[in-house]
Amino acid sequence: MRQAEDSEIIQLSMAIRECRPIEYMDGQNVKVIPKDQISTGMLLWADQVLVGTNKERYKYNAQMRSLLGRGKDPEDGDKIICLHNYWEDLSAAGDPLVNGTIGTLRCPQPGRVDFPRFIKAPTHHFDVINANFETEDGTYHCLNLDQDMLLKGTKCCDWRVSYQLGKLKNRIGDVIPKEFEYGYAITVHKAQGSEWDKVLVLEEQFPFDKIEHARWLYTAVTRASDKLVLLR
């Protein structure tokens, strides 16, 4: 119990939960520093970067892929995250593919999925990335990933087309591409329930009250099990 109480991460999380002022610090396991001191070294050091908004997520994913020497298109070895539950897609171990699962893109190839022309839609095909998704618990094979989500951060299929295709699933199969994004930086919302050794948190100010902000920040810092850098 004493060791837990002495943890810098726990001390910081308690201060946040109690809405006490957070001071800059340079501890052994926790560093709280101004956001303008962010560096490429910090981004590459972290096991996981956490942000508050999708805009920041898209920005830092692009920056980190550039730092790693990756090009515009998705590449083998890219870190990606699943954005929805796909209960019918099972890994080799029999585990369903669920929202928030982080893993590695394997063997990506550009592809195309066609759907019936009687569907009311601007086009009658989806551009996809056919790939395997490798996770700690197993590999999901031959997934058709939404290419637009990875390249632009936008869905290729709007809700009207998705609704029509969903009603025809038993007849034509599941043709809607699966929604994945790069996972180098993710939102705190997607990080709930997960934990990493080294975490970098980019604090953001939101238009909600102090209590709600404290809850968000508490969730963010407690994702770190060993070392934490909080930029604010």
Task: Describe the residue ranges of each PLM region.
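Interdomain hinge/linker elements that couple catalytic modules in large macromolecular machines
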Residues: P21, N29-L44, V49-Y58
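Alpha-helix boundary recognition
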Residues: M14, L43-L44, V221
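Conserved coupling/interface region of RecA-like P-loop/ASCE motor cores
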Residues: M1-Q37
